[in-house]
Amino acid sequence: MQIGFARSIDPIISQEVTITRVAITTEKDAENKNTEMGRKTIVPYGLYRAEGYISANLARKVTGFSEDDLELLWEAILNMFEVDHSAARGNMAVRELIVFKHSKELGDCPAYKLFDAVEVKKNEDVEYPRKYQDYTVTVHEEQIPDSVEVRRMN
């Protein structure tokens, strides 16, 4: 299994916010009544796309990776942020997983053609996207061979 780095669909603009800690956490803080200032960089909204690959040939020959393992992997990817919330990341979620399954172990079609068949486009009436619904995700199935199964999961 290989997953490439995710890239944002549209340019993102990071913002820096100032935070102040007023909670007293040590006895020394209580004596001095100190507060602490800090900064945090945030991205108000970003939709990212990542692409990944699984080699059925290597799975069979080397790792023993099975169909059951594959289903568990899909479940883990779809829920990976649900069990690891963090103030540092804000509200992150996997919105959709589009999976291509070939009929042949070495593939029916080059991966780039399958990835090119997935279009993520900002809706025309949206200038600054702030939610997933500001985008339309289209899989152009006419560009995908009949021997490749397309599965959309969310």
Predicted regions and their residues:
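Basic polyanion-binding and macromolecular-assembly surfaces
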Residues: 1-154
